[in-house]
Swiss-Prot record:
Job description of the protein: Ligates lysine onto the cytidine present at position 34 of the AUA codon-specific tRNA(Ile) that contains the anticodon CAU, in an ATP-dependent manner. Cytidine is converted to lysidine, thus changing the amino acid specificity of the tRNA from methionine to isoleucine.
Primary location class: cytoplasm
Enzyme class: ligase
Entry's Gene Ontology molecular function annotations: ATP binding; tRNA(Ile)-lysidine synthase activity
Keyword line: ATP-binding, Cytoplasm, Ligase, Nucleotide-binding, tRNA processing
The protein's name: tRNA(Ile)-lysidine synthase
Keyword Metal-binding (UniProt): no
Biological process terms in GO annotation: tRNA modification
Amino acid sequence: MNIKTDGWSKKAHIVVAVSTGIDSMSLLYSLLNDYQHTYRKLTCVHVNHGLREQSYEEEAFLREYCHQHHIDIYIKRLDLSDIVADGNSIQQEARQRRYEWFGDIIAQLRADVLLTAHHLDDQFETIIYRLFTGRSTRNSLGMTYESYFNQYKVYRPMLNLKKTEILAYQYANQIPYYEDMSNQDRKYVRNDIRQRIIPAINENPHLNAHQLLKLKDWHDIELQSLKEQAETFINNEVSKSKYLTYSFSRTAFNELNVNIKSVVMDLLFEKLDCHLAMPQHAYDEWFEQIRNDKSQFNIHVTDEWIIQIAYDKLIIMAKSEMDQYILDRICIRKPGTYEFNDYQIDIHPDLPQQLYPLTVRVRQNGDVYKLNGQKGHKKVSRLFIDKKVTLAERQRIPLIINQENAVLAIGDLYVKENFKEFILISNNGDEL
């Protein structure tokens, strides 16, 4: 049985995930008997999901097998009772917990790589599953020989082998294994693909399952191109604030095609460590809203995150992000430098003493300011509209008020005549 060994070196400590099924037992046997010269140390890991009575028999069998062959083994018993009780599917959660534990063991042992027994038939199954469940649009269509999970390396040395080759190898060497009868239950989608769809393809002389591999290769190349275009957009158009919000031009975003838009959003949520896996139909709804003519609105993402649309600006932000930093009011009694909601306020020493104390506060209904160089006053709210200030930013901008309740300055948008030499306000909110 010819497995690929270029995923590790002769000095490597390899960790092999073994379920006691025919695939993983054949891989373990092959590493012990045919490829023992390709690594320095081999350790076995096994997860007992505790969902079948036979699972404890399998655990005992593998423990004894490793003892006889002088292999270190680590076993994890998962408690999935909470998921089963809720009636939820356990497959994805069990996989997540398995691989997290594998990572813990690899870190503990300072091992180099985790080996799994995925093979070519598993690859066909994965491609079909992702295609027909809509999981292929923004993800790789299949598995790769090498990947990473939480910073540790996973390698699949049997990904080139057909199931029939593994069966022949097991039979020739009389390798002991256990059959998980749940693998025969066609209520699970992957089992149905494995037992019904793939055999039907193989039986039809006009069909060739290997064409799926060509599709995977083409798809992965195109996906990489999309990611590169999305990264270019992010590098050129997206600004990041020190509070981990991302903002960019609504117009520039609307000029992208839907595929690049989707990948841009994926990458930004990944950078925010949101752990979101948004379905394409949700993205399509968002993109339709972003294309409309409404000047300001919010798009609900999760209970913690929103997308704020403000004129030509699109902002991804935490819902609580603005409120938790907002100051409402401060009092200035002497010259100096002051901070107010990410704005820096510099009061010059030559500001007439009789003007103190100054009040710095956010806007209030009815606030007006005197127009420079002309008669009359203008509402602060109208200034914000004219300058296309976002709703959130309007709650942060400092107004400097004197004892007579006259507005001397409004953020970096306005300073009253005769005070420009004494009051300087700058917006530091976008500094990192």
